[in-house]
Each structure stands twice: as structure tokens, then as C-alpha cells.
Amino acid sequence: MILIFGGTTEGRIAIQTLEEAGKTFYYSTKGDEQDVLLHNGIRLQGAMDAIEIETFCAQHHIKLLIDAAHPFATQLHETLEQVSVESNIPVIRFERIFPKRDEEHITWCRDYDDAIEKIQKEKIFILLALTCVQTIGKLKPLWQNACCYFRILDRDSSRKLAREQGFSEKNLYYYTPGEDEQVLMKQLHPEAILLKESGISGGFCEKVEAARQLGIRIFAICRPKTSGKFICVNGEHGLRRIVEKHLPDFFPLRSGLTTGTCAAAAAVAATWDVFNIYFKKRPTEFPVVLPNGETIQVPVEPQHHIPHSDLLENGDGMFETSATVIKDAGDDPDITNGMKVVANIAIPFRIDDPLPEDTPQDDYNIIVCGGEGVGVITMPGLGLELGSSAINDTPREMIKKNVKLWLERLHIAKQPNPILITISIPGGEEIAKRTFNPRLGIEGGISIIGTSGIVKPFSSEAFINSIRKSMEVAKATQSPRIVISSGAKSERFIKAYYPDLPTQAFVHYGNFIGETLKIAAEEQVPHVTLGVMMGKAVKLAEGNLDTHSKKVTMNKEFIQDLARQTGCSEETLAAIGQMNLARELWDIIPEELLEKFGKALIELCHRHCAPLLPNGELTILLITENGKIYS
């Protein structure tokens, strides 16, 4: 059993993550003002001290604690550390993602006392504190001797707490969700603002940018240090992976890593190796920042290649080494599971090269390419140049970003010499023969195409069960509409189309469109929107309700017939016959016929899907690669 301490955005994410398991857990908040939806979770309210938490854990067989409270909830953090030590229960600290500290534009303060001292020293008379109502008492020396305004949440408990701390209500202003941060600053004209280092989800970046644009000084209190006894994560994927590690039976299937994430980890390890001038022992795992911004730890294989340099007679040389990660796809039946993902780093140099400080650069020159076992693009339509490595933009940028972050962490100066990262998959060429890659024009190896960095475990039964759980949660929100889409990419576009719907109202169907609609019908969902991209739409329009490539492939003749009916020329029909991927249709169909073709495609999809939702209203949206929506 798991007990979450929340009350924050991170608490909500923790709920959503654990709900995927379909098992009971507990969610505790100090007050009752956070509105959260729990389907499998049980809500607890009211503060608990260490003894009360220990007693609860013993009575309810709690094996794992999740601290998803605010970064500045120091009393709770300390209490959970005490409980962890005395009860031998691990604590996962769900941290926020924090931007790099801006030393140029922000005056950083160690704590509240340091903030008071620095603000008073600067003789700031008009101050806007965006530090929450609980800090009013801590900052009393400031508002006793200057004009201070506090922005707080618009609720009775906050007003009561402000009064109890002796603060004048006329200097209180209330947070309005969605309001531009500049509005209040323009109204009050403060000389400075005071912030807490509350992270990206706490709106820290928006507050800083608003103040900078208005020329207002910025003071920020550094977040408290996290206990070294906690296991730290800062996102949903990392949280799930740690839960899977400590409670292997909690989730029905174990998540895994994409090839791109493995490649990024190997590239980071190789970067560490090549600059390890003091020959320290290499860590057993390295951090990788995923496309969603969170960081996870990825195990790497023991070091077998010592960095070396080769020098030719003409003065050209090369620093070079490599590192390996064994791909772990979790419980997903991934054909590449268990394969080696190797990253080689090579940095060319000349003996007479100028020093980096003599040739300052704006950024590192990092080049990513494929080696042994990584396919080469031989046909158009995949969004990559002919002859280039089959590494999509997302994993390519993830590799570059993580290498860059590690170079900065090692204080390596930016220099004009390129840093070449070559990704190899030994055995990839043979494995690729058992995939659709050759048919798509990817020759000589596998493709690295992941978009999230994480492999969600897939089996028909387990995935359909997860759809059912998600649908039950979505219905419980009482959302006026439930939106189903294939995955993260299409969901991102369709969320912008329905900005007011709760997060839980969006359900992933993967490839199981038919099963998802049947579940929606069983749950008596009145309004369903189906978001679909071209690749699945052309299969669905033909009546294939399971769109997995192993079950059904794109029927070019069917698409040509549809295109002919919508007025496309013989030249266009011939181009359709030569395409490799359905998404090429966005470029093949003439722009003036796209809407007509899209409507015809949607109509066919609706004809096959509507009978599965006999008592509900079905809306189908066709989504382009760039997020444009046809209805």
C-alpha cells in the first residue's frame, strides 16, 4: 500500500500515475481545499505528526511513502524523514522541475532572515511578496517598516491566517487563475518582488519574466535542501519507475525505456568518460532529461573502453571513447529489448588549435549520427533526409540536450570543434529484417523514433484494462465530454482544442479504438470526441477498429479510391501509390482538396465507429502532424 502526501500539482500527478494501477492507495492533505478526483485512492484530511503517521502506516500496511508536498513544507519533509528512519519505509520525494538559477537578474536569499536583511539593506520601501500567506509572520520585520503587499489565495482560511498574523487586510491581494502576472505589478508599482524558488509548476518563471519586463527588482528565497535519505523524482515517469522498483506488484506491467533514452544515457556516460581526466570511477547510472522535462536515472554497463587519443603526423587528432546501455523495454514485447545501445563520442582536434577561451562560441557543436545497426533513410516521407540516419528529431534532440547539459555540468568550454556522437545497435540490422522498416525505406538497421522517452507496457488485455480504468476516472470527473486519442502527441494538440476540460477527461486508446468506444458505451458516456491522426484514420475509415500495424497495414488502393471520389487527379493518385506513410497524404493531396478529403475520411470513420456508441454523441477530429484540426 502507498501513502501520498500532496496538496500540490505534483500531488495531482502522483494520483494520476497511481490510478493507472487500478489499486487502492491513500492521499493525504493538511486541509480540504484541494479539489482532486480519486477513483482508487482514499482521501485523508488533517495534519499528522510522526507518531500518527507511523501508526497509520502500521495499521494500513503502508510500504511506500510519497512526499509530493510543497518544496517549502519543511516540517512535513522532516517528519517523513523521521518516519522513514524509524519505520524503515522508503520515501519518494516528488520534486518540482526547477529552472537554472539566474544569478544576473535575481538576488538569491538563503532563507527568510537573509531575505529580510538584503531587502532592508537595499532600502526597498514598496514590496510585493508572492510567497504565500504562511510567510506573512516570517516576514514581519519587512512590513512593519515598509509598504508590503501580499498576494494570497482567495479563500477564507487564507484571510483568517493573515489576520491571525496581524497583517492589514487592505494590503492583501488575491490570486486570479490565468491572470497575467504583470497586471498586479502594474497596479501596485512595487520597487521589488519577493518570491520563493517554487519551480516551474509554481509559476516561478512567469513571475520573474513579468518583473524583468517591468524593470522591477527580484529577490528569491532558495528552496530548502532535500533529505539525502529520500529517493528523488521530478515527474510521472520517474515516479512510476521507482514505485515499480520498490513495489513490483503494484502496477500490472512494468514500464521501460525507449531506444532514444538508452542512447542519450550512453552518450552522457561516454561524455563523462572522455573528460574524466582524474580517472574517477564511473557512476553506475546517469541522469537523462526526457522530452517532458523530467529527469530519470538510467543504468549503464561497466566501463570497458578507456578514453584514448589518436594523433596523426599532420597534427590532426581525435579524443574518443564509448559507453553502453542495455535496453530495458519493461514488460512491453519490444523486439529490441535486451539489445546493446552503444554511444561513441569523438572530438577531433589539432595540436595548434586555439584555446576555447580564445574562440568563444554561443553553443556546443554536437552532431548525432547512426552507426552499426541503425537504419538509413532510403525513401521520402519519413520526415528525414534521404541518406541520413533513422533517428527522429525527438531522440536526436534528447541526445544533444543531455550531452550539452553534462558538458555544462563538467564546465567544459564551448568550442568550434564538433563533438560527434555515433549511436550503434549491434545486431540491429538483423533485427530490423523482422520489422516493417525495409518496407518503409529504412535499410540496414532499426529506427530510433520514440517521442516520450518511456515505453508504456503493452499487452492487449492489460492495455484494455488500463483504458477501462482511465474511462472510469474520466467519467467520475463529470466532464461534459471525454476525449480519446492515440497517445501523447495527438493529446497535446487536442487539449488545445478543448482547453477547459480536466486532464482526466483525456484517455489514450493506443490502437484499440473499437474497444475504447465499447467501454465508453458501457460507462454510458454521453459525449465522446475521437482524435485521430492520418496513419490510423485511413485504417479506421476502412473499418479496422484495431489499427496496430501487426494487425492491419495501410491500403493504398482504398485511399486512392477515396482520393478519386474527392476530385484528386491521376497524378495525385499515382503519388499515393508510391508513398510509404499515410502522413505523406498531407503533402500529396492538393491544398484546395484537403478539407474535402478530410471530411470524407472523417465520415467513413464515423460510419464504422458510431454504432459502437449507440446512446452517445460521437465527434471525430482529424489531426495533422502540425496540430491543425479538421472536423
List each language-model region with its residue ranges.
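N-terminal beta-loop-helix "entrance" segment that forms/cooperates
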Residues: 26-48, 103-106, 159-165, 295-300
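Short, polar loop motifs at secondary-structure junctions
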Residues: 27-35, 94-99, 133-136, 153-157, ...
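Glycine-rich, highly charged phosphate/nucleotide-binding loops
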Residues: 41-57, 172-180
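Glycine/small-residue-rich loop that forms an oxyanion/phosphate-binding "nest" at active or ligand-binding sites
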Residues: 64-115
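Anionic-ligand binding region
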Residues: 129-173
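Generic N-terminal targeting/processing segments that precede catalytic cores or assembly contacts
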Residues: 250-412, 417-434, 438
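A structural signal for small-residue-enriched, beta-sheet-centric alpha/beta enzyme cores
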Residues: 254-257, 440, 446, 451-599, ...
